[in-house]
Amino acid sequence: VVSPGPGRPIDAGISMSIIESFAPVIPILGVCLGHQCIIEVFGGEITYAKQLMHGKTSEMAHDEQTIFKDLETPMIVGRYHSLSASEDHFPEELTVSAKTMSGEIMAVRHNVYDTEGVQFHPESIMTSEGMQLMANFLDTTNRRKV
């Protein structure tokens, strides 16, 4: 898990180099800043969010695959961020797997690697099915032969 934190991906220490090195080898889940790092590593751009979302909830629709398997859609997610993925500069290597009802990118999945990112916080009490999402990610890691 590449965890959340303050600032931009460029300020995230070794997070981006870890994603570059290990995405082909092991499952990775990026949360908030970790999600933004995944997007930048694969050629996308992070920009200012349409509005600040610190301690707020949103409804989010998802594709019901991998980490979203067996989760309600739409679901409520807890958000704590002021930056988000740019749709205009989104990398071809990634697929958008979830968006808010107003169209903001909330989750991405790599097209080849077991690498996923979520802009929201699954660990937040405000995220309705965060525990199951994390369990789904752990299932991915348990199935993977390293």
Question: Predicted regions: what is each one?
Answer:
Residues V112, G117-S128:
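Phosphate-binding/catalytic loops
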Residues L29, T47, G78, S97, ...:
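Hydrophobic/aromatic beta-strand patches that form the interior of the parallel beta-sheet core
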Residues G7-R8, S86, M126:
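Glycine-rich nucleotide phosphate-binding loop and flanking beta-alpha elements
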Residues I125-V146:
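Acyltransferase
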Residues T66-Y113:
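Catalytic beta-strand/loop cores that center a nucleophilic Ser/Cys/Thr
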Residues T57-E59, I105-A107, G117:
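Conserved hydrophobic/aromatic beta-strand scaffold that supports enzyme active sites
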Residues C32, H81, H121:
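Histidine-centered divalent metal-coordination motifs
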Residues V2-D70, I76, M134:
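Cysteine-nucleophile active-site neighborhood
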